[in-house]
Amino acid sequence: MNERTSDAFDALLVLSFGGPEGHEEVRPFLENVTRGRGIPPERLDDVAVHYHHFGGISPINALNREIIANVEKELASRNRELPVYFGNRNWKPFGNEAAEQMADDGVKNALVLATSAWGGYSGCQQYQEDIRGMIKHLESQGQSVTFTKLRQFYDHPRFVSTMAQLVQDSYAKLPDELRDEARLVFTAHSIPLAADNAAGTPQDGSLYSSQVKEASALIAKAVGVSDFDVVWQSRSGSPHTPWLEPDIVDHAVELNEKGQKALVVCPVGFISDHMEVIWDLDSELMEEAEKRNMVVERVATVGPTDEFAALVVDLIEEAELKRVIERLGKLPARGSSINGAPCSEGCCGTAKHQTARVNPNARSAAPAAN
């Protein structure tokens, strides 16, 4: 075992949601996602259809490995030596397994990148819970690693500028006669209103949806668009529970009925093209658009880009300097703390305001992959 005694950060853990990588993994993955939530087995069968449609493979693990490869390349370009590990909440490689490997390798003081730009329970606090679980697991093995989670990065200049370029790329793909009239629509994962109200500190108020709206405004401004929409997708809770609205497909239908012929849809809430992007947008939204002879250009996500890797290394350097360097927004960008501690007093409340993410009445019932 390597002996590392320095207080400097000596590793990065990319911590994500996880997803199956074969037909035989779909059902146990879904059982992990919904454990303790009382979801009927037949609902899991319904949701599994989405994954089996794509060969039983969620793209999220491969996309995260691509992010890791890009981060390693960016670290090397800055003459940095920092090993990068990969762990998930719901599927292999599990966070506990990654933490064990890190401890075995002699890691003492690791940074954690959660694959979410946002505040709130699902986007931030649940990753803090994952970190606490990893620490508890290591303690049961007689091992120890200190984990420091990186902050929320929804308004980092590289995030905004790269998303703006990707939006412009989508506009360029539209037919000439539709480009000027195309409507720009930003979309992010819907959550229950109670969860949004609890996001951030009591003083923040609805931090998650506010961050999504601010990021969208920053990107639109960079593109040169003054009028745009922010909508939501992937709702999967009880139909009796209020969630963030409107839904992207419902909104597209409404716009079309008012005469809109073209949309540029930017999945600002998602780092990579995982299941909810390729199902809810590339399948369901596109099918509805085709029925209506509506042209929709879906904007690429930021995760696979070199600029996103540079953003991650920027965040690492911020953590080393113990101060935030680059921000464009005015809202809080919380989320950084040690060993899963609350990042701010009262942040995200004490209750888990999320509901089970498999719903028989939802348009899309695929589990979330933040």
Swiss-Prot record:
Which terms in the Gene Ontology molecular function aspect does this entry carry? ferrochelatase activity; metal ion binding
Q: Where in the cell is it found?
A: Cytoplasm
Residues where Fe(2+) binds: 189, 276
Keyword annotations of the record: Cytoplasm, Heme biosynthesis, Iron, Lyase, Metal-binding, Porphyrin biosynthesis
Coiled-coil positions: none
Annotated GO biological processes are: heme biosynthetic process
Q: Which residues bind Fe-coproporphyrin III?
A: 58, 127
Query: Which Gene Ontology cellular-component terms appear in the entry?
Result: cytoplasm
What pathway or pathways are given for this protein in its record? Answer: Porphyrin-containing compound metabolism; protoheme biosynthesis
Broad enzyme group: lyase
Q: What is its EC number?
A: 4.99.1.9
Q: Which reaction does it catalyse?
A: Fe-coproporphyrin III + 2 H(+) = coproporphyrin III + Fe(2+)
What job does this protein perform? Involved in coproporphyrin-dependent heme b biosynthesis. Catalyzes the insertion of ferrous iron into coproporphyrin III to form Fe-coproporphyrin III.
Entry similarity comment:
Belongs to the ferrochelatase family.
* NCBIfam families (UniProt xref): hemH, PRK00035.2-1
Under PANTHER family, the record lists: FERROCHELATASE, FERROCHELATASE, MITOCHONDRIAL
Name of the featured protein: Coproporphyrin III ferrochelatase
- Give the organism the record lists: Corynebacterium glutamicum (strain R)
Q: Lineage, please?
A: Bacteria, Bacillati, Actinomycetota, Actinomycetes, Mycobacteriales
Q: Which gene encodes it?
A: cpfC
